[in-house]
Every structure is written in structure tokens, then in C-alpha cells.
């Protein structure tokens, strides 16, 4: 346990599962769980609106990587419908940067443009981009290359670039440092930490115990919603009730994540299999068992024994 005067800001993944686990294993520690993906989407919204990110205020509900923007305001003006119209046609990509984004990173462009299909199917709200994996799984499988997975892209892309840059610096060579300048994720965590340290009451999207904030979700769910960050922690914004479709999606994923935590704490193979079966990225119990067994073998040096 950390000192009662300290805050632990958890930026690790999978954030939702880590949040649930720490709630159970360290209930008295002051831990604030955060993720930058909603802020990254907000940055794309700001680009579309040709404004600064600081001018936006959003309403949002869900779990980590599993949420929806219900309202977006720019300098106090409600621009939600304007954004929906744009995203339904272009995704989270501004008209001006569409071609440039394709050249820069086709995989990110694919991610941001996938939002247009989701908005056209489910026009109530604006989605977090991670919904592509849960709602458009067949599209993702068709797009992915088994010989060049996302993990491989990170290893051979960003990680290789960083190692090469470090080696050049060690050899006294000059490099272009601008490629490593902080993005919205770095600015986001600084704003959160500043708010905790200096009681700024900054309004941020964070992961907190529900406790009635989303009225028709379980109180112990770790929900991602707006909160005012103070020296004493987050003061969540009350969301109220959410529609049945979104409630059903979230409750299923919340059950999945809760079972993952229970499986690890109890060393339960049964609960791990139940968790995998509930996950929307896995099409059947047969596939869930196959994936679980392969992951157990691949991670036997790191995982607890599941019996």
C-alpha cells in the first residue's frame, strides 16, 4: 500500500482489468486509473472542427476501450450532430488530412475511418475507436495480416525506431527529436497529475467505481466517465440511465473483465474460460477454449496456474 498522502496514477493496460483487480486487491490505496484513447479521439474531433482540444468538453460513458461520446461542446456550443454528420461520412479524419493520413499510417487511418460504419449503424452516440474490434470483428479479421499483426507492427515500427535513435545518440550522432515529441497522451497524464497535486478541478475522462454514476449499471463496475479531478481524487459526473443496447454491451464486457480478475485471484480455469467466452472478439466457446489453452502455454512462466 502507498502512503495515504500519495496518489497512484495507473496508466497500464489492460486498464479496465487492472482497475478491477486493484479495487479488490488494494481497496484502501488511492489509485486513479486512466487511459488516453478517448482523449486521442477528442483530438481528432478538434482537428475536424479546426479548433484546439482545450476548447472541447465531452460527455461520455462506458468501460475502458468500450465507451461512447454522448455530447460534444466546443466553446459551449453543442457540436454533437455536426460531428456525427462528419464521422458518418469520413470517420474521425478531417477532410484536409485524409490523404496525408493514408500516407503517414494506413492502419491508423483504417481505425479512424472504421468509425463511420459504426455511427451509421448506431447513430445515437459517437464511438470510441476500439469498438471496431467488438462490433466489426469480421472486418478486422479480413483486414489484418497474420504475418504482420499489430504487435509485430509495434515491435518493428515504433520500438525499432526508438532503439535505433538511442543507438545513434550513444554514438554521438544527431537525430530528429521532433518525431518523439509528446502527443495528447502525455499532455493528458500531466493534466491529471497537476489536478491531483494542485486541486485544479480539471474535467477529465477517468476510470472510477460506478457507485450509481451510471444509474442502471452495477455499482462495482469500473466505468469510464467525466470527473472533476481534485486533491482528494475524482468527483464523477452523474450520467443517469443509459439505453438498453449500450447497457447490455457494457454489462457483458464488465462480467468478462470481472471473471478475468477472479480467475487470476482464484487460479480458476473455469472462470478464465467463462471470461473468454463472454468476450465479443471471440465467436464461440470452442474458440475461447482453444485461445485460452494456447495463451496458458505461451505464458506459463508469467501466469498463475489455472486449475
Task: Show the residue positions of the predicted features.
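Long, compositionally biased stretches enriched for glycine and/or charged residues
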Residues: 47-307
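Internal, well-ordered domain-core segments that constitute the primary functional module
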Residues: 1-75
Amino acid at each position: 500500500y502507498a502512503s495515504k498522502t500519495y496518489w497512484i496514477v495507473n496508466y497500464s493496460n489492460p486498464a479496465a482489468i487492472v482497475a478491477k483487480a486493484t479495487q479488490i486487491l488494494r481497496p484502501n490505496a488511492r489509485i486513479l486509473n486512466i487511459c488516453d484513447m478517448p482523449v486521442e479521439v477528442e483530438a481528432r474531433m478538434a482537428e475536424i472542427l479546426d479548433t484546439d482540444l482545450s476548447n472541447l468538453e465531452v460527455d461520455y460513458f462506458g468501460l475502458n476501450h468500450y465507451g461512447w461520446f454522448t455530447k460534444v461542446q466546443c466553446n459551449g456550443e453543442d457540436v454533437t450532430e455536426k460531428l456525427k454528420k462528419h464521422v458518418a461520412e469520413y470517420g474521425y479524419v478531417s477532410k484536409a488530412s485524409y490523404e496525408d493520413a493514408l500516407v503517414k499510417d494506413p492502419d491508423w487511418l483504417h481505425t479512424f475511418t472504421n468509425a463511420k460504419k459504426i455511427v451509421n449503424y448506431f447513430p445515437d452516440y459517437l464511438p470510441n475507436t476500439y469498438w471496431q474490434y467488438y462490433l466489426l470483428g469480421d472486418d478486422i479479421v479480413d483486414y489484418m495480416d497474420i504475418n504482420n499483426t499489430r504487435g509485430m507492427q509495434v515491435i518493428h515500427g515504433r520500438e525499432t525506431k526508438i532503439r535505433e535513435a538511442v543507438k545513434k545518440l550513444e554514438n554521438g550522432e544527431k537525430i530528429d527529436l521532433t518525431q518523439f515529441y509528446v502527443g495528447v497522451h502525455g499532455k493528458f497524464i500531466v493534466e491529471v497529475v497537476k489536478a491531483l497535486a494542485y486541486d485544479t478541478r480539471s474535467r477529465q475522462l477517468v476510470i472510477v467505481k460506478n457507485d450509481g454514476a451510471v444509474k442502471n449499471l452495477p455499482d462495482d463496475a469500473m466505468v469510464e466517465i467525466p470527473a472533476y479531478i481534485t486533491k482528494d481524487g475524482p468527483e464523477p459526473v452523474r450520467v443517469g440511465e443509459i439505453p438498453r443496447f449500450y447497457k447490455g454491451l457494457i454489462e457483458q464486457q464488465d462480467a468478462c473483465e470481472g471473471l478475468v480478475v477472479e480467475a487470476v485471484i482464484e487460479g480458476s480455469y473455469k472462470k478464465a474460460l467463462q471470461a473468454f467466452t463472454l468476450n465479443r472478439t471471440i465467436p464461440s466457446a470452442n474458440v475461447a477454449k482453444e485461445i485460452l489453452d494456447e495463451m496458458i502455454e505461451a505464458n506459463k512462466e508469467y501466469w498463475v496456474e489455472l486449475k
